[in-house]
Each structure stands twice: as structure tokens, then as C-alpha cells.
């Protein structure tokens, strides 16, 4: 499986501000002046930059793709990250009306569906999309978002073929006899779902918009531990710091420290922290990643156990498992 991240922000899109951009430019110039010599290359300077300057984590809301070994495409959620995905797809078979893809929706809060009206392949005749979710009225919800009073082109009037499939708990959904999909419900206002994708012996879990806290993790693990256990890759909600998670109790999101605990307890191989808080700058996200790595290492040392490889979700990040 090839997993690619197209949108990693939570709640609402977060463009880089002019002030943040100027601070980056200042940092780059200062680093260049401090380390300049006739033998110093541009690449050398870039390597010296702090991660929050050299990397743009991304401001688009949630969208992730899974591509199977057979080339089948699954699209997880339709935040604003769906727009650049669509721009890429129309340079390929979608531009000729030859794309078939499966959507899977965790839930329909705006940051997980707001990119759909701007998904260009949706408007091209011949393309086919299967919309999968446990949500009974998913079609109605997506159609309502594009009512003429809100958007100039209604969802049902787009030119692609659209099919809807309601998933059932404890019943696996299979794509082309190779990619097996399961789901479980999560704790989040209005409800949400985690998806597990399996191909051969490999497994990937997408679990955004969930509030794991305290002893609830133990009870959840006892009920659903097999779902998460030993995944090759887990992308998990980690929107808040621990202090902010306490201040926003019942808002439906997890702290980065609790996300790390979950990854360790479930013995996953790779853990990706995602659904970044929109008010957090890239500098703060870099700091959170460092703190999460420190927490991970301390846990490993204290318990003498193997821990997951840790990543901070970044637009354009790709995993091959």
C-alpha cells in the first residue's frame, strides 16, 4: 500500500500568514549570513535551518489517499487537501474520465467534506466514485453542502457517476479482492469512525477526530485492541497539548502525549500525529513533535520496550508499507 497525506490540519484551513512568512525569510537570511563561505551551498544552508523553517507542515484540512498494489485508489475524507489531489488526478486518467475511486468518510464535520465541491474529477463525465461510510444519510449530507444557495453547482448535477454504499459494523468491505476495509466507531461529538486497510500481511489505520483520555483508553483497548494492534502504520488525532486537552474536555480530540501512549500500547510500527490545531504555528508544531519524541523515548527507557517510529503529519508525506 502507498499512503499519501494531502491535508493534515484540523477544524479549518490555515494558510501561512504574512508575518509567519517574513519570520521564515528572516531566519533563512540569518542562517545564510552566519554560515556563509565560498564552500557553503544552498543545500548546506537548508540543512542548517530549524524544521519549522525548512518544512511547511501544511494548512489544508484532512485528506489522505491509499493506493493498493493493484492500483486501486481510496480517498479518506474530503477536506481542502482534496483540491490539490484532484488537480493531480486530472493530469492522469481522471482527466480523460477513466478514474474509478472509493471515498471513505470518517464523519461529515465541515473540515472533512469542504473540499468536495472543488474536486475537479467530480465534474468530468466518465469518472466513477463510490462513497463509502457507515453514515446512513451520507448522500443527503453531501448534497446539502452543495445546495444552490451555498454553491453554484449542486452535487447531484456533477457529471461523474456516483454510488453510495452504507458500511455495516463487523462486515469487511473488499476492493478488487485485495484491499480489505474495516471500521469501528470513535468518541467524537456527532460520532466518527476509524478505518483499517489490510493488504496481504500489511495494515494501515486512519483514526482522526477521536478523544482518547485516561482510563478510557484501557477500556477502549479491551474492546477494540485487535483493531489497532500491531498496525504497520497508524495516523492518529493528536490535536492538542495535554493542558489544552484538559481545557477542551469533550471537544472530541486527543493530546499528543495520549496519542503516543496509544501507539505504544497498541504496538504499532509507525505512528503519525495529525489533525493539527489551526491556531498552532509550525514552530509550535515542531516543539510538540520534539516533546512527543521525548515522551516516546522516556516511555521506552522506563519500560524497556520497543516503541513506534514517530512522525509529524506533513502535506506530501508518503508511506509505502
Q: Each predicted region: which residue ranges?
A:
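Active-site flanking residues adjacent to catalytic metal/cofactor-binding acidic residues
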Residues: 76, 106, 206-208, 236-238, ...
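Binuclear metal-dependent hydrolase catalytic cores
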Residues: 1-205, 214-215, 225-226, 282-321
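Cap/insert and terminal regions of metallo-dependent hydrolase folds
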Residues: 203, 213-308
Amino acid at each position: 500500500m502507498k499512503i499519501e497525506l494531502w491535508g493534515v490540519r484540523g477544524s479549518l484551513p490555515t494558510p501561512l500568514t504574512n508575518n509567519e512568512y517574513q519570520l521564515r525569510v528572516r531566519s533563512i537570511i540569518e542562517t545564510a549570513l552566519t554560515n556563509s563561505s565560498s564552500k557553503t551551498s544552498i543545500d548546506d544552508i537548508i540543512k542548517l535551518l530549524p524544521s519549522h523553517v525548512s518544512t511547511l507542515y501544511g494548512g489544508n484540512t484532512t485528506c489522505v489517499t491509499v493506493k493498493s498494489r493493484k492500483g486501486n485508489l481510496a480517498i479518506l475524507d474530503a477536506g481542502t487537501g482534496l483540491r490539490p489531489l484532484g488537480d493531480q488526478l486530472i493530469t492522469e486518467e481522471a482527466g480523460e474520465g477513466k478514474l474509478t475511486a472509493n471515498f471513505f468518510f470518517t464523519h461529515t464535520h465541515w473540515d472533512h467534506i469542504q473540499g468536495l465541491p472543488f474536486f475537479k474529477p467530480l465534474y468530468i463525465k466518465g469518472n466513477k466514485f463510490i462513497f463509502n461510510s457507515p453514515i446512513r444519510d451520507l448522500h443527503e449530507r453531501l448534497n446539502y453542502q452543495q445546495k444552490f444557495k451555498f454553491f453554484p453547482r449542486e452535487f447531484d448535477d456533477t457529471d461523474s457517476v456516483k454510488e453510495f454504499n452504507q458500511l455495516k459494523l463487523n462486515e469487511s468491505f473488499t476492493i478488487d479482492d485485495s484491499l480489505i476495509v474495516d471500521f469501528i466507531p470513535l468518541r467524537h461529538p456527532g460520532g466518527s469512525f476509524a478505518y483499517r486497510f489490510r493488504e496481504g500481511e500489511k495494515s494501515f489505520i486512519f483514526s482522526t477526530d477521536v478523544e482518547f483520555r485516561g482510563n478510557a483508553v484501557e477500556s477502549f483497548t479491551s474492546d477494540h485492541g485487535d483493531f489497532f494492534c500491531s498496525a504497520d502504520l497508524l495516523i492518529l488525532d493528536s490535536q492538542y497539548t495535554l493542558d489544552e486537552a484538559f481545557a477542551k474536555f469533550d471537544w472530541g480530540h486527543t493530546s499528543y502525549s495520549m496519542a503516543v501512549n496509544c501507539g505504544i500500547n497498541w504496538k504499532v510500527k509507525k505512528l503519525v500525529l495529525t489533525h493539527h490545531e489551526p491556531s498552532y504555528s509550525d514552530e509550535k508544531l515542531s516543539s510538540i513533535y520534539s516533546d512527543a519524541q521525548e515522551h516516546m523515548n522516556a516511555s521506552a527507557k522506563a519500560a524497556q520496550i520497543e516503541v513506534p517510529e514517530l512522525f509529524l503529519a506533513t502535506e506530501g508525506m508518503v508511506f509505502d508499507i
